[in-house]
């Protein structure tokens, strides 16, 4: 029997990002309102799993890249690794920041008083926001995620070394589960580091049973997330487990029926830009336009298409300005 590959490929990573960005839009559109009914509100809350998916993929991807080169295990190698990661993150964030903030202030009237308050030093707040450190007090409230991922990037070398000891991993996993933000990132590191062991184990099971089990568990966990009152088995605590099931479903299905997940991967490639801009569209500047479509599916589709269109424009602008050439220059500078 041929050996199946259950490692998460780049295509499958992008597909999962595509799922995550759709979940993010659904979450932000509906989690604060009962206007469209209780079911839609619950689905909006379930969409919060997007955070866990992005964190899991970050932990998995960082570990995969880190292990590809033994030079990374040296102090200089680790610094170079983090430098390259931060260059990619900050350049893409700053590109949108430097367009969106001036445009928001001067064209749409979203002054700095609104996100930063009237009793703060706006220049200092703008600087810390530019560095991705403002949490929910960012010019765009959705950018709170920036500070979280920056912290995890800095912690990554330490966490990677801790996962070298299997007994410590087994002891730490239940503890990690107690912290909803940390858990998926740490799970990503562990799964990636021991992906050969995971692959060996999954190859002992029938391919279809893995897909079926992952699908059933993902659906069940969504119900449990919203309906359970059991401590640590509801809300964001359970999102890391749901993410594992979704990842297994995507990878498992690719082993049963080879697919390139074309639509999801396309969205995944634009997920960073869509994350950075979608709140400007549906919350700050064009709320009436998005919600005028009345039906939840159409509302999501409207935000999805407008966010995607804006991302495409951003990518075209990057090409015109030789953004990626400049990024490559900086990546190879150190």
Show which residues each predicted segment covers:
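Membrane-cytosol interface segments of multi-pass membrane proteins
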Residues: 1-174, 210, 258, 266, ...
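Alpha-helical transmembrane segments and terminal signal-anchor/GPI-anchor hydrophobic tails
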Residues: 4, 179-275, 280-288, 293-302
